[in-house]
Amino acid sequence: MGWTVGAEAVDSDVAVALWRAYYTEVSDRWYLLHEGRATDPDELERGIAGSDGAELVPPGGQLLVARYDGEPVGCAGVRLLDVGTAELTRVFLYQRMRGKGGAAVLVAGAEDAARALGAARLVLDTRSDLVEARRLYMRLGYTETEPHNSSRYADHWFCKRLDVAPGSVREI
């Protein structure tokens, strides 16, 4: 069966569990790097509760879930920023699934979702400590650019043109 990627409601149990895992990992990594500790549990809960994922709901966005042999193991989101630009966000795979090719499949699914939303380019931001993410994006043809936002947690910004040939958009 292998890897599959499909649309998921942001409020599904699967999506909520993946959002919690993603947020916990990126928050803990930031705090460990900058303050030498994991995220305070109360702060972690506030952060998780602080995003309902509304920006990832059609028609302006889409949440995708990666599954391996049917088991949900990762996610990615896209949201329209303007008529031709979408942002890639929440790209995540459980640690035990990394290095198995799923990240490339997940990002390809997100690129297809962005095309389906009408985007001709996809932008994203990431942090310096997320070295593996930066390597992935460069390997997949993303180019480092000037900042497209003022996120406190962003150190690197990337962009990729989404070539859309007639009839090339796949349903997700």
What is the meaning of each model-derived region?
Residues 99, 112-116, 143:
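Conserved amphipathic alpha-helical interaction elements at protein-protein interfaces in regulatory
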Residues 94-100, 128:
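Active-site acidic-Proline motif in GNAT/NAT acetyltransferases
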